[in-house]
């Protein structure tokens, strides 16, 4: 795997996307444009539609109505360019670390797998079993497994939620660093608002199946923990999440 910039990322366009489960409307005519290479965090209350949006983009669900596009192409037609990470690293315990990274690949993939492991700081653990790794190291392997496919779109479903505080900060820095290096588009679903504003270019609040807040994070990188501006943005998002009767309020865009 070339360590140079891999691609320009996948541009996303959702036009009036709805998702229903019987009478339950999870996404309701949602419109969204994400430019290629943007890092977007999605927050909101449980059941608001965050994970459903991610599953639609991953091709694990199909919309009830509307279009999900990569530019002008249906995203489903280029699904191989999309990779997803979960809270559970989902490593196969009977395969070595490097074999987990190269899972499903054919041909001469070992060099690329070693480079992907080097990118996440684990090339020296390539021959070990997953059971020997910590939770954070397992997530690094899962990240390497995504990187080897040179994704245009990386979907992150609470991938750091089970990690301790220090490991979580280290993984945040690693993900942002690799995003800056390789240029893929990122969509991160998280319940941690501080994580959202620390990592993303843009924070979306999804509530009752629609976008209730679209906030630009206008803070230069690298971002300093404890900065006043980060705290202000975090407080604004938290206040919005906690509001009641929000379904009648218009979308607010900043930046």
Curated annotation (Swiss-Prot):
InterPro entries: AAA+_ATPase (IPR003593), ABC_transporter-like_ATP-bd (IPR003439), ABC_transporter-like_CS (IPR017871), ABC_transporter_ATP-bind (IPR050166), P-loop_NTPase (IPR027417). It is a peripheral membrane protein. Its EC number is 7.6.2.14. It is found in: Cell inner membrane. ATP binds at residues 44-51. It catalyses: ATP + H2O + aliphatic sulfonate-[sulfonate-binding protein]Side 1 = ADP + phosphate + aliphatic sulfonateSide 2 + [sulfonate-binding protein]Side 1. It holds the Pfam family ABC_tran. Keywords: ATP-binding, Cell inner membrane, Cell membrane, Membrane, Nucleotide-binding, Translocase, Transport. The keyword S-adenosyl-L-methionine does not apply. Residues 12-233 form the ABC transporter domain. One of its GO terms (cellular component) is plasma membrane. CDD domains: ABC_NrtD_SsuB_transporters. GO terms for molecular function: ATP binding; ATP hydrolysis activity. Gene3D superfamilies: P-loop containing nucleotide triphosphate hydrolases. Part of the ABC transporter complex SsuABC involved in aliphatic sulfonates import. Responsible for energy coupling to the transport system. The complex is composed of two ATP-binding proteins (SsuB), two transmembrane proteins (SsuC) and a solute-binding protein (SsuA). Belongs to the ABC transporter superfamily. Aliphatic sulfonates importer (TC 3.A.1.17.2) family. This is Aliphatic sulfonates import ATP-binding protein SsuB. It comes from Escherichia coli O6:K15:H31 (strain 536 / UPEC). The gene is ssuB.
């Amino acid at each position: 795997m070339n360590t140079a910039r891999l691609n320009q990322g996948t541009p996303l366009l959702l036009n009036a996307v709805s998702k229903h489960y019987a009478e339950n409307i999870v996404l309701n005519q949602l419109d969204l444009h994400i430019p290629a290479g943007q890092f977007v965090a999605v927050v909101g209350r449980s059941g608001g539609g965050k994970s459903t949006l991610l599953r639609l983009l991953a091709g694990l669900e199909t919309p009830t109505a509307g279009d999900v596009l990569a530019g002008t192409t249906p995203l489903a037609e280029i699904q191989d360019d999309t990779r997803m990470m979960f809270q559970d690293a989902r490593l196969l315990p009977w395969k070595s670390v490097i074999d987990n990274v190269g899972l499903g690949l054919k041909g001469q993939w070992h060099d690329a797998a070693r480079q992907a492991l080097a990118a996440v700081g684990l090339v020296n653990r390539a021959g070990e079993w997953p059971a020997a790794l910590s939770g954070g190291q397992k997530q690094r392997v899962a990240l390497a497994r995504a990187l080897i496919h040179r994704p245009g779109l990386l979907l992150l479903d609470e991938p750091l939620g089970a990690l301790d505080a220090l490991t979580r900060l280290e993984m945040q820095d690693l993900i942002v660093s690799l995003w800056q290096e390789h240029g893929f588009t990122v969509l991160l679903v998280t319940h941690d608002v501080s994580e959202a504003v620390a990592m993303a270019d843009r924070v979306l609040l999804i509530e009752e199946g629609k976008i209730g807040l679209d906030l630009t994070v206008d803070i230069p990188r690298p971002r300093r923990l404890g900065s006043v501006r980060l705290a202000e943005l975090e407080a604004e998002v938290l206040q919005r999440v906690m509001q009641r009767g929000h379904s009648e309020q218009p979308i607010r865009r900043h930046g």
